[in-house]
């Protein structure tokens, strides 16, 4: 941590799912600026990854919305507070600082000193699922890329592996005319059926009909690599081996392999932070949602307490009480309850000062 520039923060929220985003909002109302760290390259957590196009019916005041729509609404709600986002990063270490705050570092090399920390990591950090093929890891970052990682595609033979919205979107992006258009695009999935938004499925079909995208119903069973000159080590990935649904095998040449196999949650370093855990969840005090250490809070699916219900709306309640507790912790004194309908200070923080009261 000594080699990285230390970022000072009043609050750091670990996790950018709906509860983490609402935590930012509640902290903003208390006048506390927040930094947000998430392993995904975008905000939204489970809602964005697993329920983007699925309807949600139990958000108060919103009869129905998709996961994507809920994330967009929360993004709009926190905009006045301009949180600093540290995406595609996972917190690796968390330790007490001499002044009573917290020091932690991410796997991307960022180092932060936070006066308060809010663990809103859901069921854990979402990390891309990988392909369990011997030797493929040596090509990661040069020819093999996971999930939404940027990848060179211009003029290349691109193979996209996966059957959900990210795979479909990446295949379309590679096949569309433009400066990064691939020479060829092959979308490989175990069956010729895909889960994506209707407009993306329609565009995929159009690109298939025009010959810009080829779809193969198969599974990858191995890789093919050319030897590096002068050594027995493979220097370049040249293709993958496929087992088709009819039992036949074939080789598929490629320059770039995009693995869009979804993501899976991992509790990861949270388990090593010395917190009181019960079934991989952080035990909290329901008055403050403190994780047992002054200034450290846990909200949402990552916490547990008697009567716990893993619902988004329950997480919103937890984030509200945690923000009040943090404000009192930082101030060293009780914090007055204010209402957004009448408080001039809250309206100023929201950027709506002078707005009339209905």
UniProtKB/Swiss-Prot annotation:
Family classification: Belongs to the ferredoxin--NADP reductase type 2 family.
Record's keyword annotation contains Oxidoreductase: yes
Naturally occurring in which organism (per UniProt): Paracidovorax citrulli (strain AAC00-1) (Acidovorax citrulli)
Protein name: Ferredoxin--NADP reductase
Catalytic activity: 2 reduced [2Fe-2S]-[ferredoxin] + NADP(+) + H(+) = 2 oxidized [2Fe-2S]-[ferredoxin] + NADPH
Domain of life: Bacteria
Alphabetized UniProt keyword annotations: FAD, Flavoprotein, NADP, Oxidoreductase
Cofactor section: FAD
Name of the top EC class for this enzyme: oxidoreductase
Family annotation (InterPro entries): FAD/NAD-bd_sf, FAD/NAD-binding_dom, Fd--NADP_Rdtase_type_2, Ferredoxin-NADP_redctase_2
The record's free-text note on cofactor binding: Binds 1 FAD per subunit.
HAMAP family in the cross-refs: FENR2
GO terms for MF: ferredoxin-NADP+ reductase activity; flavin adenine dinucleotide binding; NADP binding
